[in-house]
């Protein structure tokens, strides 16, 4: 399979996993802990394909984000209105939210080029949290796809939301995905670091479940 096709496939898989994880769509909340891994792998494939990674990854990221938005917001199309209204009702939020979700991934790439991978991971976490916070406070708020909402069918997992709010779940999901990704990315080159990151991933995943 051509490299570009593999990148597109990985990005699309990420969007599909998020849809399957989402309440009222798939409901497999545990998939949230691995749903970003195909997207992060797509980024690695993109860097290998473009050598120095200078070509934009943004369009590839948008594919997965668009699928996630479309598969979880399709019900806007079910309104009892003319077809034009149906298309606008689903198209505007899906496209708009896809672009907003793409901004943290775009800025992550900029951070990775100038500061390195660790800072890029930190940038993604901070920027995504900031984006979700914005979505809860401005006039165009659309909190439906905030990552922390994925545990809506598993309240026993997130009793601590009373202290952290939904953003605590978002942080949990992001850090777990990034920690697992670090294990995968370093497994062949630095086994010791991979083991350390594996221990971190288990701690990040497990501690909130027993809190």
Identify what each model region corresponds to.
Residues 1-211:
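Membrane-embedded alpha-helical bundles of multi-pass enzymes
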């Amino acid at each position: 399979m051509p490299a570009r096709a593999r990148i597109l496939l990985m990005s699309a898989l990420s969007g599909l996993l998020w849809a399957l994880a989402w309440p009222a769509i798939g409901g497999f909340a545990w998939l949230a802990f691995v749903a970003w891994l195909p997207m992060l792998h797509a980024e690695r494939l993109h860097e290998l394909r473009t050598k120095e990674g200078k070509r934009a990854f943004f369009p590839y990221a948008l594919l997965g984000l668009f699928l996630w938005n479309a598969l979880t917001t399709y019900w806007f199309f079910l309104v009892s209105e003319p077809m034009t209204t149906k298309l606008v009702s689903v198209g505007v939020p899906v496209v708009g939210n896809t672009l907003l979700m793409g901004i943290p991934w775009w800025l992550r790439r900029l951070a990775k080029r100038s500061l390195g991978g660790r800072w890029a991971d930190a940038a993604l976490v901070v920027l995504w949290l900031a984006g979700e916070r914005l979505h809860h406070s401005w006039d165009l708020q659309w909190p439906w796809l905030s990552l922390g909402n994925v545990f809506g069918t598993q309240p026993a997992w997130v009793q601590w939301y009373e202290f952290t709010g939904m953003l605590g779940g978002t942080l949990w999901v992001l850090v777990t995905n990034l920690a697992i990704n670090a294990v995968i990315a370093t497994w062949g080159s630095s086994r010791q670091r991979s083991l350390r990151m594996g221990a971190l991933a288990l701690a990040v995943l497990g501690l909130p479940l027993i809190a």
